[in-house]
Amino acid sequence: MKKIINAPENYVDEMLKGIYDAHGDQVKYVNGDLRCYCTAKKKDGKVAIITGGGTGHLPLFLGYVGEGLLDGCGVGGVFQSPSAEQIYNVSKEVEAGAGILYLYGNYTGDIMNFDMAAEMCEMDDIEPRSIVGADDVNSNANPDTRRGVAGIFFMYKCAGAKAAQGGTLDEVLAAAQKAKDNTRTVGFALTPCIIPEVGHPNFTL
């Protein structure tokens, strides 16, 4: 697979900087950290919705930060979770007095770091709630342990719309939960993945 990039080790940050340069009227990064994204304008009294995950599934995750969707996003390296501190910093930036809803995929690192960020928010008297996407029926027969991939978008949209209408944290969470409960996806690969910094396929087909 051919990739048009400069240095592989700079790929993620250069990509994020490019997106910011192209859409700086809609998004900004937090505390000078390119991997902490949020909307350019905060609406007081609105439930803040935050996601995050590893780079490599564009437009997930930062591509859905914007009006009527998400308020913020933590971005990790390729297939790496954002840190708890990054998620917390985004949370502090976008929190608007109505609580925070975390929506993210069912991956060990994401769960661990979002849980830690939630604990940090609670210490600041910010109320966090979480829903973990688990839509990919191809990854596991047990619904509780499935991956959360493409289907997470529907949680974004439903929760974002309810939050934009002025819904409470409970109402926004219920909208996201309904979307999760009614969404299934099937994930499959046609070619093996090549992580830029590794330079060769992760597996063979």
Task: Pin down the residues of each PLM region.
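Short Gly/Thr/Asp-enriched flexible loops that form oxyanion-binding sites at enzyme active sites
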Residues: 111-125
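Glycine-rich oxoanion-binding loops at beta->alpha junctions
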Residues: 57, 64-97
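Internal, active-site/partner-interface "lid" segment
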Residues: 139-146, 156-205
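Gly/Ser/Thr-rich loops at beta-strand to alpha-helix junctions
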Residues: 54-59, 105-114, 147-152
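Short, acidic/small-residue loops that bind anionic groups at enzyme active sites
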Residues: 73-81, 122-148
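N-terminal amphipathic/basic leader segments beginning at the initiator methionine
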Residues: 1-49, 200-202
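Gly-rich Lys/Arg/Thr-decorated short loops/hinges at beta-loop-alpha junctions or inter-strand turns
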Residues: 44-52, 61-74, 137-139
